[in-house]
């Protein structure tokens, strides 16, 4: 056995063994050697977008999953660790436009390369279950379930105001609008009314909220979903009016509805604000060119609540009035740029005295501000020129200047106002949710075609929107399209567009919108269980699901996880599955960070520099005091920008392939597991990578030196162990017990620490004729080290396991039994305590493990250092710290 740690040949040999035996392909209902059914464990990382190359975030995510899967397999679980590709979406189209190739080719080429990278990492993936969401065999089931949802009324078509990117010619999700601009094009986003398909996720708001309670998810993620769903209880009521349309009918039956959680402030209403698209706004703008222009301005910008909360509040009076339901006073109606038609009724009541947004609006437009709640102690006083936080308080306040509601607390007033409005027939208590229905239509090519055929046109309605018959699924996306950036290329494909109406047989036109890619990622984890199933899912899904452990970034806390939970409940209601939640446990790994460096030109424009191209100038304490570009003869000033998330934009990423080529996959895996606990941020360190590599070389060299003696050693321990052997086993099994605990709580950084401690203990031991430790004892201890280290460092440990001969007696390492802690060996009959004289360490003493304070004192006083210090006299005091030390004050 070579003493050189040749990671290339070691990793190639291990991977050849695994691939040749197809060791990662798992089957349902697997049994152990005794024929007993194994418990299943489904551990899955969020599937990646095939962007072309893995980044270090991928490496960390998949290594966490792999460590978990390997360790649980050794514990006897039937473990599923699959992988797939979230293959549809805009990046492929953008790359296709840039490279003038079909998105399909770009995507499949990237998948092939990234699979090679994953293989190089040594991941225990069952590739027989691979799924690519751009494959018609996969997305046909998106289409099939869409049709089922259409039948049940869960999917529906409507026209709604959306974010429209005029450059990319597509609808943008709220999350794709940044500071009012399209995330990719940078164009000012417009508000447009566009017909599209929606999923009625709001009908599931309550179960989506209550279902969080039983999940083993981080509280932070649960809170984010709770806030996104946004349950609130309040009063929905109407302001009456007599504003008629062109036909003489009262608009919306003469009722302007609003929803409020602060019905106790109803007597302070001094205006109402409506969305730019509200029927009252449209009515008022018909004869008001200034208002019409303002409404058009409102249609540019985001439809996101968060953006609206921070943008400048603007409004314009419509000239219309509605009637206050309790005071019967006229209330002016304004158009506000902060009111969304898609939220609630598209109108809000304005109470400037007790809502900070309304307060600012009223000051700007000189609207009345009427105080209607006051602190119980009436101090401090209300000031209509300056906002104070207590104005919006619910606790410790009472109604004031509110007629029959004066003196009532918040809760009392809400109840009383609700009853008064209910008695008038224009209001009631209502539960409202912030959650909006999920719009899935995208004016994009590279996505799942929506299975709808349009029959007729404006002059001849025909059959309208007709679902594609199930027998005609999938509606296959032509994969040879090359987008040019001028909108959806499907609109130019007659071979895709032209079709006969399934109802009447007349010429018709396919829907060219495709589904939001979140549809693809909402159920892929179920398709892994039966990728070749003739139905959407089959009985294998019931075996593996719900998933035991899901792993992914915190950035997916809301949309992906929420949509996946919704999709699961839909499938349950359609009797496709029996479970209610998809992911029992969730681990959100921290981001990978690295140093950033940049240079600036005369205009202040930054050019971000890769850390590998920068040389640091360190002070005497090793702290950076400056930096320069390597090989730069122009002395370009380099600014140290601090530690930030690895990203293309900051040019501070580390190429995993380059890392594996230079150090090997085991070193990369060891570093990302050791550098930080999984949930915490990981700061990249070249020195840390070097340290991981040195540790693995130490492991290899130590085993290579003992291999020949260990191969012939017995697996049975001697019946009579000497003191050194007992102590060695106690130390190793103590560390094993801690490692087991750390594996259980997913603290893999301290698992690596445990392996390092074991090596430090074992490394000094050499098997020779004078060795105090016998070969069988060392063989047992080293087998524990290899098994503890194996999930993190599978290649090196796999080869050593074979070289030392463990495979002959215990089988391949990946299925070797997880080591059991020998509790008996942990029991100590004797312990060592530090001995101090007058607070200074003077040696140690051995005492019985169960010795009481008096016995410890006696043994300490009998020791040679104590006898010498006391010189026949008595001590002033003896201090015993149980289990640690004895201090004799002479």
UniProtKB/Swiss-Prot annotation:
Catalytic reaction annotation: tRNA(Leu) + L-leucine + ATP = L-leucyl-tRNA(Leu) + AMP + diphosphate
Main location: cytoplasm
Ranges spanned by the short sequence motif 'KMSKS' region, renumbered to the chain: 645-649
The entry's keywords: Aminoacyl-tRNA synthetase, ATP-binding, Cytoplasm, Ligase, Nucleotide-binding, Protein biosynthesis
UniProt-annotated binding residues for ATP: 648
'HIGH' region, short sequence motif: residues: 48-58
Family that this chain belongs to: Belongs to the class-I aminoacyl-tRNA synthetase family.
HAMAP family according to UniProt: Leu_tRNA_synth_B (MF_00049_B)
Protein name, UniProt field: Leucine--tRNA ligase
Encoding gene, per UniProt annotation: leuS
């Amino acid at each position: 056995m070579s003493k050189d740690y040749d990671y290339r040949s070691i990793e190639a040999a291990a991977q050849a063994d695994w691939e040749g035996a197809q060791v990662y392909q798992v089957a349902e209902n697997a049994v152990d050697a005794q024929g007993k059914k194994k418990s299943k464990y489904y551990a899955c990382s969020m599937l990646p977008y095939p962007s072309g190359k893995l980044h270090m975030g991928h490496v960390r995510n998949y290594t966490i999953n792999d460590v978990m899967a390997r360790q649980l397999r050794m514990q006897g679980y039937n473990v599923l660790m699959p992988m797939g590709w979230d293959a549809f979406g805009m990046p492929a189209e953008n790359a296709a436009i840039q490279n003038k190739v079909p998105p399909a080719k770009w995507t499949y080429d990237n998948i092939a390369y990234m699979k090679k990278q994953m293989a190089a990492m040594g991941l225990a993936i069952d590739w027989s279950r691979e799924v690519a969401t751009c494959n018609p065999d996969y997305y046909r089931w998106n289409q099939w379930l869409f049709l089922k949802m259409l039948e049940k009324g869960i999917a529906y078509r409507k026209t709604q105001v959306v974010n429209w990117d005029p450059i990319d010619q597509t609808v943008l999700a709220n999350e794709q609008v940044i500071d009012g601009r399209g995330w990719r094009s940078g164009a000012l986003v417009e508000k447009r009314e566009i017909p599209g398909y929606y999923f009625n996720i709001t009908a599931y708001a309550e179960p989506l909220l209550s279902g969080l309670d039983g999940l083993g998810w981080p509280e932070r993620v649960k809170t984010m979903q709770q806030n996104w769903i946004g349950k609130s209880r309040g009063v929905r009521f109407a302001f009456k009016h007599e504003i008629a349309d062109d036909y003489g009918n009262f608009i919306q039956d003469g009722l302007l509805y609003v929803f409020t959680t602060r019905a106790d402030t109803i007597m302070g209403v001094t205006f109402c604000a409506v969305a730019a698209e509200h029927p009252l706004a449209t009515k008022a703008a018909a004869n008001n060119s200034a208002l019409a222009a303002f409404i058009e301005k409102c249609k540019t910008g985001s439809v996101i609540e968060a953006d609206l909360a921070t943008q400048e509040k603007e409004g314009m009076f419509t000239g219309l009035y509605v009637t206050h339901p309790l005071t019967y006073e006229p209330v002016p109606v304004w158009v506000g740029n902060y009111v969304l038609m898609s939220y609630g009724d598209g109108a809000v009541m304005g109470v400037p005295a007790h809502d900070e947004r309304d307060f600012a609006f009223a000051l700007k437009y000189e609207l009345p501000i009427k105080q209607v709640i006051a602190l119980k102690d009436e101090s401090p006083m209300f000031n209509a020129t300056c906002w104070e936080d207590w104005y919006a308080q619910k606790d410790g306040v009472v109604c004031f200047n509110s007629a029959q509601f004066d003196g009532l607390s918040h809760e009392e007033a809400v109840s009383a106002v609700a009853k008064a409005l209910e008695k008038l027939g224009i209001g009631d208590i209502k539960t409202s949710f912030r959650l909006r229905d999920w719009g899935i239509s995208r004016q994009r090519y590279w996505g799942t075609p929506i299975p709808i055929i349009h029959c007729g046109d404006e002059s001849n309605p025909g059959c309208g929107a007709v679902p594609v018959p199930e027998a005609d699924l999938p509606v296959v996306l032509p994969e040879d399209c090359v987008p040019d950036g001028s909108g959806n290329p499907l609109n130019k494909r007659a071979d895709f567009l032209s079709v006969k109406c399934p109802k009447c047989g007349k010429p018709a036109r396919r829907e060219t919108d495709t589904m939001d890619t979140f549809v693809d990622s909402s159920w892929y984890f179920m398709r892994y269980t039966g990728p070749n199933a003739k139905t959407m899912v089959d009985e294998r899904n019931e075996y593996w699901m719900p998933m035991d452990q899901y792993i992914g970034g915190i950035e997916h806390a809301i949309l992906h996880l929420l949509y996946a939970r919704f999709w699961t409940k839909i499938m349950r209601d359609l009797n496709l599955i029996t479970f209610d939640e998809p992911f029992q446990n969730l681990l959100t790994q921290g981001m990978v960070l690295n140093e950033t460096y940049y240079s600036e030109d005369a205009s202040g424009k930054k050019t971000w520099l890769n850390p590998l191209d920068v040389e640091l100038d360190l002070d005497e304490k090793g702290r950076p005091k400056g930096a320069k570009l390597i090989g730069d003869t122009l002395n370009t000033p380099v600014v140290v920008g601090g530690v930030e998330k690895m990203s293309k934009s900051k040019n501070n990423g580390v190429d995993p392939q380059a890392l594996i080529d230079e150090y090997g996959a085991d070193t990369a895996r060891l570093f990302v597991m050791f550098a930080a606990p999984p949930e915490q941020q990981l700061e990249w360190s070249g020195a840390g990578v070097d340290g991981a590599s040195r540790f693995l070389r130490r492991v290899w060299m130590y085993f290579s030196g003992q291999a020949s003696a260990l191969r012939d050693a017995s697996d049975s321990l001697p019946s009579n162990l000497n003191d050194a052997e007992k102590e060695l086993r106690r130390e190793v099994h103590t560390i094993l017990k801690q490692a087991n605990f750390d594996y259980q709580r997913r603290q893999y950084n301290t698992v690596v620490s445990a392996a390092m401690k074991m090596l430090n203990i074992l490394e000094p031991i050499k098997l020779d004729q004078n060795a105090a430790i016998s070969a069988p004892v060392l063989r047992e201890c080293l087998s524990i080290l290899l098994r503890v280290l194996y999930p993190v460092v599978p290649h090196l440990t796999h080869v050593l396991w074979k070289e030392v001969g463990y495979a002959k007696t215990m089988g391949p390492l990946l299925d070797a039994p997880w080591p059991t802690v020998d509790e008996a060996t942990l029991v100590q009959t004797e312990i060592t305590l530090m001995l101090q004289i007058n607070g200074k360490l003077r040696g140690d003493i051995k005492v019985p493990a169960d010795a009481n304070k008096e016995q410890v004192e006696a043994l300490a006083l009998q020791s040679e250092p104590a006898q010498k210090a006391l010189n026949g006299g008595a001590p002033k005091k003896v201090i015993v710290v149980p289990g640690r030390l004895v201090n004799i004050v002479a």
